[in-house]
Amino acid sequence: MAEQEEQLLKWMPAVVEYRQRLASLQGAWDNLALLSHLGDDGTNLSSTREAFETLANHLVTHLGTETHLKTVLACESRAQVAIDILVRNLFERTADVGFLAADDAIRKYCRDVPTLRAVIAEGGDEGDGARRTLQMATDAIQRRLAEYVAKYSVYHNVVLVAPSGEVLAQLAGGSAPARTQDSLIDATLASSMPYVESFAASDMVPDAKRALIYAHRVTFKGDTVAVLCLCFKLEDECGGIFHRLRNESDWSVLGLIDDQNRVIASTDPYQLPVGARVPDAAGKHGGIVRFAGREYLAITRNAKPYQGYAGPSWRGHVMVPVERAFESQDRSSQAQCPPEALADIRRNPAIFSVGLREIPRQADAIQRDLNRSVWNGSVRLSTGSAQNVAFAKALLREISNMGRKTKDVFERSIGELHETAVSSVLQDSEFVASLAIELFARNLYERANDCRWWALNGTLAGTLAGREGCDAKAASAVLTHINQLYTVYHSIVLFDVERRVVATSREDQQHLIGARIDESWAGDTLGLVDSQGYAVSKFGPSAFAADQATLIYSATVRGADRRAIGGVAVVFDACTQLKAMLVDALPHDEHGKLLAGCKAVLFDRDGRVMCATDSSLTESAETLETIGRNLTSNGATVRRIGGQYYALGTQTDTGYREYAGIGARAVVLLPLGAVPERGVEQRRPLPQCTATRNDHSRHDMREYTTFAAAGAWYALPTSCVIEAVDSKAVQTITTAGPPWAGVIIHGDGAVPVADLSKLLGLPNLEDPSVVILMRLPGRERPLGLLVEALGDNPEVPADRLLPVSVLEQRQESLLVEFAIQPVNVKDGLVLVVAAEKLVTQLFGGSGVGAGTSVPAPQERQVA
């Protein structure tokens, strides 16, 4: 284990608990290993003890790694989402400032103010008239700025500044001084970029230590007449983002930091104060940092560029007090995972590392070796002349019990971690669905803003009103310019009060001019009561989107008397944009590649599919439509879709800020593994072997060794058993047919091995892991029986041995001598195989395998 993760283990309660349990078991193994040297059964526990010790260390290592990784991934996700959502928001602001700076009313106002102020300075009647004109113009521009901020509510002030630094206008109640000294003005005047971004102290926002401002030159006929400054509500926006990423019981501290590691915004002013410089955690993948006298697990994530914009070099940052970072999380999400599904997922744990998945298999292998060793020890005690047999048998029983306890600890630790992991994936699916719907709502918020603002455009209103100098050609030019700036739209349309198309932004839609819009959204638009209202279409195909499915947002265009004279409709490029949102929300690897199997679907409020990230999902539309109709609440559950188990998270669109949303629902599918084929993945359960309980109070006792094959228990007299060995040593003989499985080298010779299931005419063995070597009456060479598992070595009273007639016509009766009556009536019989019948069956007489040639090993060829 890496040094850092070793240091973190002490803060992982679940791992500490299992480490203590394993240490306690290891001490018991040490004692048993010592005692085994005193017994006469020949059992050597050294290799078993060392194997369990090695596996225990591997388990602790993997548990620590998985626990650390789970916490790190959760923190990375939140840090990434925090900065990415903000960057998407700021990208819209970079477009806003350039478009607003080109607004005709703003340009004319900024051109006229210096002239009017010069006239006012001269005094006289002309000065008084100019003062009144300036006041009316300022009132009008303030109303226009207020209209803008009413729609784009992410700004707390809009300031127009003359090249000299004099403030020409701002929102009513704005706090900018009469003349600003902000260097942003000179920087903007000298820039030819589409926008200038500043995060620094500014006298235009005196209440903030640093303000985020977007600026652009305002020009009139090629001359710069002002600088437009949009003052962004950074603290307000960050608070909203952080609120959605945390819950009340969350110990993590979320923040944004700049490229100098200084805190820009934070959820906790005491643990992570704004302006403080934090230790660099970039690239440490969940390393420990010390800050303000406390240790934290810290994560820093760079912004992912959106449409080529990466933001102002800020990063998402998450810190969790290290003593709280790995506390057991709520596994209530398991309630949404049906028991059958959870059992299947455990058998096919695709969400675990290969190393962790191997531990249960390794534990099974060690347990099988131990069982075989104990079984052989019991056989030796029964057939030999060992002293102190009672002590040796008691020791073997304790060794067997200790093996089961150790294996149980391994199974429970893996099982509980698996349950936690499934719960974590369920929570992740719900989180990703929330992110997807957040991106969706924020995007459509901007669409509702755009159509309402553009409906106030003077050229568009003049065209509909028939004003001189305004016509369809001029309107189309305006719409085309807007569409070139805002590429999320397929087209933008202007229509009149008769719902007829007047202008469009696309050259290939000119044939639609003059056509009447019959869809209900056009009528809804004309019925809006004020400039804050907007209409939205149902999701579906439209001629304005080349007959592709789309959403259309529209707002009323009003004349001088405030009455509706038409509308502006923005036609969303839904197919492209919705899929991009869903893909961006899904988890990606460190190289930016979408994680395999992760999918997302967007439904409308009626459960119809709007968009899916994977074409295979849309091909199974019936299943998707069923899911869409049956989703009634937000949350997470496990569903089977197309032969796969998925963690299915869902979240409904409730809007963003004042935007109400359209009731859409995002559904995210994160893979949990394939659905196993029934009858293949499940092994036949063995009945309880209660016939094997020793009963020393009875006389005429007979000792047997028991074993399992093809879902049932069998027994042999202990006196004819030599030992059990691993079936891996069996050499297959291609020329030998059933029932022979091959040969095994034992001592100085080769021993033929017969498959018990083939001898008895039973189903194939599912796990042929053991070969029992036995003596046969009248034959020098031993025989090997291929079986599945070993049982106990009981002493059974003769009166519990039932005649073979109880088996009626069962195939096993050909080889069975007795049936041992079970202690528990509900349990199955244990069938005693007769060695004499085996000889007849295999080497003479009639029946399955009679007269077949005994296989011999082939010489190995040396390359």
Explain the meaning of each model-derived region.
Residues 138-153, 183, 227-285, 322-350, ...:
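Solvent-exposed, extracytoplasmic
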Residues 224-225, 263, 501, 564-565, ...:
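Glycine-rich acetyl-CoA-binding "A-motif" of GNAT/NAT acetyltransferases
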Residues 11, 15-193, 245, 375-531, ...:
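Extracytoplasmic/periplasmic sensory segments of membrane signal-transduction proteins
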Residues 142-232, 237, 285-299, 481-580, ...:
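Extracytoplasmic/periplasmic ligand-binding sensor regions of membrane-associated signaling proteins
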Residues 102, 158-165, 253-260, 290, ...:
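Short hydrophobic alpha-helical segments used for membrane anchoring or interfacial signaling
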Residues 1-66, 220, 274-424, 620-690:
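Extracellular/periplasmic juxtamembrane segments that couple receptor/chemosensory ectodomains to their
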Residues 213, 225-231, 313-319, 552, ...:
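Short hydrophobic beta-strand segments that form the core of ligand-binding sensory/regulatory domains
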Residues 666, 673-863:
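An acidic, low-aromatic, low-complexity terminal/linker signal
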